[in-house]
Amino acid sequence: MEINERSFSDKALEDFELIDKAVNDKDQQAYASLMKRYKKAVYFMILKMIRGADDAEDLTMEAFAKAFKNLHKFKKDYTFSTWLFRIATNNTIDFIRKKKLKTMSLNNTMTD
């Protein structure tokens, strides 16, 4: 796919190169570089959403696992960071919903 280089930052273009290496060459170093580049930012975004350090760490790892599993589907219409943060956000929202459902079902069990 052709990329309009003027519409992306240098960092985004570097991400595209790392993604190509990860997907096409199965380059583990490329995966590691992407994770190193975004892990803290993803973690702190999730931490703001749930305010639990252990859960935030777990959800950060889950977000990267989902992103890397589907990296071959990534389209270069947007930056990798936008795509990754959307995955992390959706995964965290799912976690919050499941947690609320468990709390509600426990409350219902106790009142029955």
Task: Name every feature range the model reports, one short phrase each.
Residues 73-75, 86-106:
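Arg/Lys-rich amphipathic alpha helix in sigma70-family domain 2
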Residues 28, 53, 57, 71-77, ...:
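A short, glycine- and basic residue-enriched loop/turn
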